[in-house]
Amino acid sequence: MEKIKLGILQVNHDKSEDIGDKFPDDAHRFRDLFDSLESRFKYRVYMTIGDELPNDINEQDVYLISGSPLSVRDNHSFSNKLYEFIQSCDSQKKPLIGTCFGHQAIAVALGGKVEKSKIEWNVGLEKTNFNNFKPWMLPEKD
């Protein structure tokens, strides 16, 4: 079976003593997770936090945008290029998934709004309530 080419757009490069020195970076965590389930992927990490993005959207079969302690509400040096890349993925129907910062970046790039949480940020599951539903959001569930 041919491996799926997965491009990981890393937007976190934590070098703090508390986190960065004790845990693997996001790209390694995702590779470890996916490889523990089934080794069907060939990985390429793009250090998007350092302005690195694929030269051609078709370099990979699918893309994943990592999490980050950064906020999409701030303008980072890589933000506009990342949003343009997300819009290209959307218009060309290229599979794309985002986690944490990544899903927020996808929302902003596609016209959504990200607001500061009233309860500070957290790690883990959080209940989400939708105000309106789109046809692709099936079945409708809160």
Labelled PLM ranges:
Residues M1-S77, K81, D90-Q92:
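N-terminal beta1-alpha1 cap of cysteine-dependent amidohydrolase-like domains
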Residues L53-E59, A105-A107, L138:
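Short loop/helix-cap segments at secondary-structure boundaries that form the rim of catalytic
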Residues D74-H76, V108, K118:
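Conserved catalytic-core motifs of eukaryotic protein kinase domains, centered on the activation segment
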Residues C89-L110:
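Catalytic nucleophile loop
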Residues L110-D142:
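Pocket-forming structural segment of enzyme catalytic cores
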